[in-house]
């Protein structure tokens, strides 16, 4: 599937399904928040949420007082969903970026790079290498990277697309020696349909 076809797939999905109709929906992004807190950073830290289009993590970060938040997603519709949910006042506090992360050009540095369930859709090694290159360019020494994917015993497909399942060692290998693993967790995510999906989260 080309990048254009992938974008069309996600635009169609967000236009035709409500947030409770997608398997990755979380009312509260508890694990992500715990891992971000574990970095020990203050609320003026810059955070980017990759693939966070319609996620409620941005809501939770604003509630905790974070003031330098960027949300990047391939889908314009997903970003519009979050903007509408937040309301104009809160949405204006966030930088919104509609882009393919593998082709995106970072324009600033981020203290935290967070990704829940975007990276595992990159099935082409070239795309994974491009992703890792963006991480290296966007996260300075001393910065933090948090990546959540389906675990080795997690689903093989999501929303009609194939995924790559990971453990922390595999993600470490892709990111390279610039990032040291600080913490790894497995997590059973219960979908709105009542199905348990095994995730792994790695914090570098």
Say what each PLM segment does.
Residues 111:
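Conserved acidic residues
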């Amino acid at each position: 599937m080309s990048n254009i076809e992938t974008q069309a797939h996600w635009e169609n999905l967000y236009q035709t399904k409500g947030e409770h109709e997608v398997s990755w929906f979380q009312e509260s992004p508890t694990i992500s928040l715990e891992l971000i807190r574990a970095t020990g950073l203050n609320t003026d830290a810059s955070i980017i949420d990759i693939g966070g289009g319609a996620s409620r993590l941005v809501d939770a970060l604003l509630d905790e007082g974070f003031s330098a938040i960027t949300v990047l997603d391939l889908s314009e519709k997903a970003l519009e969903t979050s903007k509408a949910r937040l309301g104009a006042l809160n949405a204006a506090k966030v930088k919104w970026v509609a882009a393919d992360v593998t082709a995106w050009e970072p324009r600033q540095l981020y203290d935290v790079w967070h990704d829940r369930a975007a990276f595992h859709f990159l099935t082409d090694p070239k795309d994974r290498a491009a992703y890792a290159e963006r991480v290296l360019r966007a996260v300075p020494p001393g910065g933090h990277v948090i990546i959540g994917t389906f675990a080795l015993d997690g689903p093989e497909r999501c929303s009609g697309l194939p995924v790559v399942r990971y453990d922390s060692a595999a993600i470490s290998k892709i990111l390279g020696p610039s990032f040291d693993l600080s913490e790894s967790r497995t997590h059973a995510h219960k979908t709105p349909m009542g199905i348990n999906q095994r995730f792994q989260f790695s914090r570098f």
